[in-house]
């Protein structure tokens, strides 16, 4: 038993340590960007509208400025709002902001592997390898263009089979876009009714729905506790295991027929690199292969299909815009050949429409979180190593000095007085800096080729009055989603 004197010393020492830690944290807070005062554990939860986090952040930026601090639960986040702050951080101080921020909902699946690697240098090598491999398999080149056009052909046949009946096009778009990345990752496409393919799309959809749900948002804030509690997150854990098992089996199939001298797809290329780098600390191992492949599937399925889904709705709401795109397709491409990606250089109006669809949709306004990789000073504020940063890409898309009347859908945002395509510095749908979207060139090609191929063959028809179309995405937590709708594809 401790005597009273010794016990008193222990208590005083403990209190002193607690005081010093509190003092140190207070000094850090004083040097951090300003922001609303957080409550213990729940942070700024009560000050955020969890149904529309982007609007809450916009309101906070009006009070605290373009650089401020919020707490999502116990997690401290530095927010960058507006073009100047985002560019200064991600371009001018790119190295300091090059870490990958935490996405707890998707970490359920990726577990810190693949593109979620916490080791910055290993993450860079995986990323460089992936970009090089995507290029090897034709991303940005004619090889992948042929793949996209092949899928577009299957989609056209499917839509022709609807005979103009009203349908919800979302599942058709998901199948088409997913098959493009499937061809790169697996080396083959799936039949649209393949049960394994449909199961894969369903699981990806379940993950995305969970991430956007109220439970998913709470998990992002309080994952350290919620991962042990009953609830929808436990079902998602089962879904992630099925996804992992699916990919492990695909890797096993590839490995059994691997020719080191002739890689057929992304998985083959990674397996060959694994054989070349067998040292203990190499980042080229099975976990990173499985999770990098899954990461490509997620990135390559959702964004483009959702953008097209909203694009169809916007073109029906604005038939004058659709008519001008049809006219440009007729004049530049005609009806006797398939569109080619090089056509976009001669089709400024169509490209402006695609850009404006992306800008107006603004489906992931909060962007991908970054992480400070070393103690950094930014605009006079101290950002400690390990701080997560939200560069609000959506704020760039609505900045009035770049996009006057930004609440309106207007392709003129991207056209000059002569009707030619003009660059807009704030149009950064794929982000910027060292963590920009590695599939941006593939996405640009898909958007142009799929939209022009569809409009070369069909006119869009809404089954009700145009006034009934709600063209604005609905805010759901950290994201925005497109209202479900039906439409008819009328053959030309």
UniProtKB/Swiss-Prot annotation:
Top-rank EC class of the record's enzyme: oxidoreductase
Keyword annotations from UniProtKB, A to Z: Endoplasmic reticulum, Heme, Iron, Membrane, Metal-binding, Microsome, Monooxygenase, Oxidoreductase
Protein name, per record: Cytochrome P450 2A2
Record-listed heme binding positions: 437
Pfam families xrefs: p450 (PF00067)
Main subcellular location: endoplasmic reticulum
Names of the cofactor(s): heme
Biological process, per Gene Ontology: coumarin metabolic process; epoxygenase P450 pathway; xenobiotic metabolic process
InterPro entries, A to Z: Cyt_P450, Cyt_P450_CS, Cyt_P450_E_grp-I, Cyt_P450_E_grp-I_CYP2A-like, Cyt_P450_sf, Cytochrome_P450_fam2
Family matches, as SUPFAM superfamilies: Cytochrome P450
Classification via CDD domains: CYP2A
Reaction catalysed by this enzyme: an organic molecule + reduced [NADPH--hemoprotein reductase] + O2 = an alcohol + oxidized [NADPH--hemoprotein reductase] + H2O + H(+)
GO-annotated cellular components: cytoplasm; endoplasmic reticulum membrane; intracellular membrane-bounded organelle
Function of the molecule: Highly active in the 15-alpha-hydroxylation of testosterone.
Keyword Endoplasmic reticulum: yes
Protein family per UniProt: Belongs to the cytochrome P450 family.
Location within or outside the cell: Endoplasmic reticulum membrane; Microsome membrane
Tissues in which the protein is found: Liver specific.
GO MF: arachidonate epoxygenase activity; heme binding; iron ion binding; oxidoreductase activity, acting on paired donors, with incorporation or reduction of molecular oxygen, reduced flavin or flavoprotein as one donor, and incorporation of one atom of oxygen; steroid hydroxylase activity
């Amino acid at each position: 038993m401790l005597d009273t004197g010794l016990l008193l010393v222990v208590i005083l020492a403990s209190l002193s340590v607690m005081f010093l830690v509190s003092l140190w944290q207070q000094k850090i807070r004083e040097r951090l960007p300003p922001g609303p005062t957080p409550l213990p554990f729940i942070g700024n939860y009560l000050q955020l509208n969890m149904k529309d986090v982007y609007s809450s952040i916009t309101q906070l930026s009006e009070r605290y400025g373009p650089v401020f601090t919020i707490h999502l639960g116990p997690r401290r986040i530095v927010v960058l709002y507006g073009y100047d702050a985002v560019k200064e951080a991600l371009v001018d101080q790119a190295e300091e902001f090059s870490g990958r921020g935490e996405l707890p909902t998707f970490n359920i699946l990726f577990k810190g592997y693949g593109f979620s690697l916490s080791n910055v240098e290993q993450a860079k090598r995986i990323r460089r390898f992936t970009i090089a491999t995507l290029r090897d398999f034709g991303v940005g080149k004619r090889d992948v263009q042929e793949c996209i056009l092949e899928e577009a052909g299957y989609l056209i046949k499917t839509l022709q089979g609807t005979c103009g009946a009203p349908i919800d096009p979302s599942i058709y778009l998901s199948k088409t876009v997913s098959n493009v990345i499937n061809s790169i990752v697996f080396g083959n496409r799936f039949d649209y009714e393949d049960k394994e393919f449909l199961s894969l799309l369903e699981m990806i959809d379940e993950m995305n729905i969970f991430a956007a749900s109220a439970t998913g948002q709470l998990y992002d804030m309080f994952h350290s506790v919620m991962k042990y509690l009953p609830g929808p997150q436990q079902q998602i854990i089962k879904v992630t295991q099925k996804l992992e098992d699916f990919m492990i089996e695909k890797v096993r199939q590839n490995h059994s027929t691997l020719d080191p001298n002739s890689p057929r797809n992304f998985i083959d290329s990674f397996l060959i690199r694994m054989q070349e780098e067998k040292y203990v600390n190499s980042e080229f191992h099975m976990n990173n292969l499985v999770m990098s492949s899954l990461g490509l599937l997620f990135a390559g399925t959702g964004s483009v299909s959702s953008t097209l889904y909203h694009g169809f709705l916007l073109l029906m709401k604005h038939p004058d815009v659709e008519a001008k795109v049809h006219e440009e397709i007729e004049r530049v491409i005609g009806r006797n050949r398939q569109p080619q990606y090089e056509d976009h250089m001669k089709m400024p109006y169509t490209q402006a429409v695609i850009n404006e669809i992306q800008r107006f949709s603004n489906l992931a306004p909060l962007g991908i979180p970054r992480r400070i990789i070393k103690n950094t000073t930014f605009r006079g504020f101290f950002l400690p190593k390990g701080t997560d940063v939200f560069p609000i890409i959506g704020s760039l898309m609505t900045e009035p000095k770049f996009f006057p009347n930004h609440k309106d859908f207007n392709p003129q945002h991207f056209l000059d007085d002569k009707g030619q395509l003009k660059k807009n510095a704030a149009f950064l749908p794929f982000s910027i800096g060292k963590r920009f979207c590695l599939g941006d060139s593939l996405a640009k090609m898909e958007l142009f080729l799929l939209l022009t191929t569809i409009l070369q063959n069909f006119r869009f028809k809404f089954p009700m009055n145009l006034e009934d179309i709600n063209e604005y995405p609905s805010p759901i937590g950290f994201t925005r989603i497109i209202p479900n709708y039906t439409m008819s594809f009328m053959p030309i």
